[in-house]
Amino acid sequence: TLAKNGADKPLLVFADSMAFVYAVDPATLEVSWKADVRLFETSTITGSISYHGGNLFVPISSYEVAAAGNPQHICCTSHGGIIALDAKNGDRLWEWHATEDATEQGVDRDGNPMFGPSGVSIWSTPTIDAARNRLYAGTGENLSHPATDNSDAVVALDLDTGELVWQFQATADDVWNAACLNGGANCPENAGGDFDIGASVIHAKLD
């Protein structure tokens, strides 16, 4: 992502799979700053970072969807989100969490504790609507029960504060993780279809 550092000097901004964001001077390739944006140990970044108005908007997802395929993994405590950073220095401006913190919800077939709500990853690049001062993002499924009303949904956030303005859920009760591929212990009861809204939201004017 091409951004500016506040002095009209360009920056190249990118993220790695461990949820660290880097800003690099494109002329010298020197790292201007580095920011740790992990919400959890399993946080990752799969979409590009959006830039608008001197700020960066980072989509947070989680590879716990795959880790849950291991029956020894205690499922599931992570969730997705959006984090806003100051492009000048990487300072965190606000963060939006896709679910509340997970709490114990019972046990799996093997007697291990299960936690929820979880999931609702932001897999793709957030869409900026400058005219309305909004950010739009698509969300993934829940990884464990209880299901939330913003999984498999489009969410609209205020660009300045990160507050949720509205949401539209396309598919309700989609609770799924990789344990469902082989009937593993972490597969939720009444598992959903693993639908997600995996692509970026398209902002267009309809005549």
Which sequence ranges carry the predicted segments?
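Noncatalytic, solvent-exposed loop/strand surfaces
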Residues: 1-207
